[in-house]
């Protein structure tokens, strides 16, 4: 076990526990908020444990310590966390601070994306109702602020207001889209085909996923509500929810606001 400490500007320390293995590769699991990243990370934790691969959840560790994405992503010594034999996961924003590093460039990476219109609708319900409030720190104060803002807006008002921020998130991933080491999964393709998705991710990372393991993971992770649950974390998984929650005019306006990167990923935005 190795401990890596990053001195933060506020005088604190971001501490990560790593288990390097020079004989195994570095792996990355990347995502976008409200696009199935929590489910992907849980599945990967199960797969990684079965395959003896340590998982480093950098964003989660940072969040619990009170640090947000800009705090760690821009850290000049972020590269020090990279060790062979680890899966780096938990990302809902692009770790651009690592993009130039050879260890990142050559690492196998998966990226899970979702129709941005559905992601924004999902984000509204999470912000307004289902996010568990964390400890009172800078990160927690931001979530509390977003909840207050969401509760004062309609779904449509919220998604139109937040579209620019989601564009920013996906545009930061754009430099990776031609990366030969990147495998892209679309939420719409995998949410109702989880066994195949589990096997695909395992195979890409060089892991095994026998039928018994896939069955165990499915028993734990295959949560599909029979009806919408607005205040629950797993609210509604079926694609196309934006068509039920937004007006035709709202969808047209949102389509016009969304980044070309979404079209590059294969989403038809009209």
Give the predicted meaning of each segment.
Residues 1-145, 156-184, 257, 261-269:
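PAPS-dependent sulfotransferase catalytic domain
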Residues 54-72, 178-248, 252, 256:
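The conserved 3'-phosphoadenosine-5'-phosphosulfate
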Residues 148:
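Active-site cofactor/cluster-binding pocket
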């Amino acid at each position: 076990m190795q401990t890596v400490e990053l001195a933060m500007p506020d005088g604190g320390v971001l501490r990560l526990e790593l288990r390097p293995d020079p004989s195994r590769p570095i792996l990355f699991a990347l995502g976008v908020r409200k696009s199935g990243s929590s489910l992907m990370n849980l599945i990967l934790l199960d797969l990684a444990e079965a395959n003896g691969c340590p998982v480093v959840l950098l964003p989660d560790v940072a969040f619990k310590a009170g640090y947000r994405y800009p705090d760690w992503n821009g850290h000049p010594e972020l590269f020090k966390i990279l060790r062979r034999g680890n899966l780096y996961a938990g990302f809902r924003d692009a770790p651009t601070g690592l993009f130039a590093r050879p260890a990142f460039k050559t690492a196998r990476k998966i990226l899970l994306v979702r129709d941005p219109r559905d992601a924004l609708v999902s984000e509204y319900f999470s912000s307004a109702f289902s996010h568990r409030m964390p400890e009172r720190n800078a990160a927690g104060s931001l979530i509390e602020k977003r909840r207050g803002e969401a509760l004062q807006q309609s779904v449509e008002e919220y998604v139109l207001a937040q579209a620019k921020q989601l564009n920013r998130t996906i545009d930061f991933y754009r430099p990776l889209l031609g990366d030969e080491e990147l495998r892209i999964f679309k939420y719409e393709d995998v949410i109702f085909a989880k066994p195949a998705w589990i096997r695909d991710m395992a195979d890409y990372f060089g892991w095994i996923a026998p039928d018994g393991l896939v069955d165990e993971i499915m028993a734990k992770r295959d949560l599909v509500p029979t009806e919408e649950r607005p205040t629950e974390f797993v609210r509604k998984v079926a694609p196309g929810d934006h068509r039920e929650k937004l007006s035709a005019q709202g969808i047209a306006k949102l389509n016009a606001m969304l980044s070309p990167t979404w079209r590059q990923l294969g989403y038809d935005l009209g």
